[in-house]
Design a protein with these regions (language model features):
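Cleavable N-terminal export/targeting peptides
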Residues: 1-40, 432-438
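Subset of outer-membrane beta-barrel
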Residues: 29-438
Length: 438
């Protein structure tokens, strides 16, 4: 009888590949992502954006100057060619999410590393940049109680982990006035874990089953960009930009483990009675999405900048895990800007940068015949700190809030209402820049 019930448990487990968002309750766990949608693809994508850019909706392709100064824009490496000072930029990230499904809700919160980047000018040769950025996060936990005749069981799924990207980039001005190009060479690395469990909490005679899948992702990637800068007179300027990626492939070392524990309680807390480990697959390749972004910004000196981006990413070549629907195309738009009331004013609040933006994305995920959309408004401040070294050092504290929603309660899906807080710090200085004496 136990063998028959064990086969029942495994058949329930193996039938749950795509049940994820059909579960009646969703809960988050301690990761940097609290999204049930992060189980698809490589997780919830973080993008190569600073808090300054996020507060302006995520504009990136055409962003070259901000507040009259060159900005470190990893999303378009052509911008490195504009740097005239060494730039350090780092941040932390916080997330507050309300998950809703049907009439039930759950609240989560977490804080994590944002990014750390450096930019160094190389005089007429252009500029280079290097750093470490988060690439994606996985973090979800959901369960459903069901009956099989008189037998009651709980089916649950959970995942955690994330990918990071270390990069080195170079941008250079071309002989054609105003035109620049650049590229980033990156190394992607990290671990993603997904777990499916079937538990029989009220029956100690039936074994609980756990299936754990680990993905170890490693590999090199390349992205590139181009910008055209033009002065419009009266201290106004315009930058048109494009950035994209190649058909990057990275390696996926995949391993699976099946575990049997005693019933009558939590499978994760019980002692394992038996374990089956599958051989590690070393030769799997993951196709990263092909991306194309175009954007434009218009600026007036230190006073203001406005911009817009169109973003496209094709995930249809991404190999999904067994039981999951194929991914599609991610299409998005971003609008935003920055305003400084009076750069020469002695009043402090007149020299603060005020930022506002909005974005809308049709994501690559379609579930229950409905596209999952993501939309948000954002706002932030660039708070200047005291200048030192006779005006050669400019430091700024960047605070950004994103207020958005992903998904919907319709079509039996999960709705996420979230607040993302980004706290960043920027230093512009003359490190590594050789001075001259007249």
């Amino acid at each position: 009888l136990k063998n028959r019930l064990l086969r029942v448990a495994f058949s329930i487990l193996l039938s749950g590949g795509a049940l994820s968002l059909g579960l009646t309750a969703v809960h988050a766990q301690t990761t940097t992502s609290h999204s049930p949608y992060s189980q698809f693809g490589l997780g919830q994508m973080r993008e190569d954006l600073t808090p300054q850019q996020r507060s302006m909706g995520g504009i990136a392709a055409g962003l070259r100057y901000l507040g009259g100064l060159p900005t470190l824009n990893v999303s378009n490496p052509a911008s490195y060619s504009a740097m005239n000072r060494t730039i350090f930029d780092g941040s932390m990230y916080g997330n507050f999410t309300q998950l809703g499904k049907g009439s039930g809700t759950d609240q989560t919160a977490d804080f994590a590393f944002g990014h750390i980047t450096f930019g160094i000018p190389l005089k007429k040769a252009g500029g280079l940049s290097f750093g470490l950025l988060p690439y994606s996060d996985v973090g979800y936990n959901a369960y459903e109680d069901q009956n099989l005749g008189d037998l009651r069981y709980r089916k649950s799924i959970a995942g955690d982990g994330g990918l990071n990207k270390a990069y080195f980039g170079y941008g250079v001005n071309l002989p054609i006035k105003g035109l620049s190009i650049g590229a980033n060479a990156g190394y992607l690395f990290g671990n993603l874990t997904d777990r499916a469990t079937v538990e029989f909490p009220n029956n100690a005679e039936i074994y609980n089953t756990i299936q754990t899948n680990n993905r170890y992702v490693r590999g090199f990637m390349l992205d590139y960009g181009m910008q055209y800068f033009r002065s419009l007179g009266n201290r106004m300027s315009m930058t048109i930009g494009y950035s994209g990626t190649l058909n990057n492939q990275v390696r996926n070392e995949n391993s699976s483990m099946g575990t049997i524990t005693s019933g009558g309680g939590s499978a994760l807390d019980a002692i394992a009675l038996d374990t089956i480990i599958s051989p590690i697959s070393f030769n799997q390749r993951i196709n990263l999405p092909l991306k194309h972004n175009i954007g434009i910004t218009v600026s007036k000196g230190y006073n203001w900048t406005v911009g817009a981006d169109f973003k496209y990413a094709d995930w249809s070549y991404m190999q999904q895990r067994e039981g999951q629907a194929p991914l599609g195309k991610n299409i998005g738009v971003a609008l935003g800007g920055q305003f400084k009331p009076d750069p020469t004013s002695p009043k402090y609040f007149n020299i603060v940068d005020y930022r506002l933006g909005l974005r809308y994305n049709q994501t690559e995920v379609t579930l229950n015949n409905r596209r999952v959309n993501d939309m948000a408004i954002s706002a932030g401040f660039g708070i200047p700190l005291a200048q030192k070294s006779f005006g050669r050092t400019f430091s700024m504290l960047n605070i950004t809030g994103e207020f958005g929603q992903r998904g919907t309660l319709q079509n039996n899906l999960v709705r996420e209402r979230y607040i993302n807080i980004h706290l960043g710090f920027t230093i512009n200085d003359t490190w590594f820049v050789r001075g001259s004496i007249d």
